[in-house]
Amino acid sequence: MQFTESSLIPGLKTIQPPVFHDYRGEYIETFNEGRYSFTDRHGRPIRFVEDDVSISRNHVLRGLHGDEKTWKLIQCLLGEIYVVVVDMRSDSPAYLRWES
């Protein structure tokens, strides 16, 4: 599992899970509680409690909304995705910075 920390937005991480290949195809572990032991900016553990799937038609723009208690694990299962993240934490040194 490869983790990359954002240089623009503190706390933003990109996770690249390993892909296991064999004669049957590919296997990717999308979530494992033991591997995702993150804390928020106050040092409190982050607990993954909900998993959702969104299926969009071509050229659809969706907005993701968050708050202090919510974090997002975003993955593209098929096709392409263009993700833009904006730091909306008003007390963050990266306030209103964005990354895509």
At which residue positions do the language-model features occur?
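Non-catalytic, conserved peripheral segments adjacent to functional cores
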Residues: 1-100
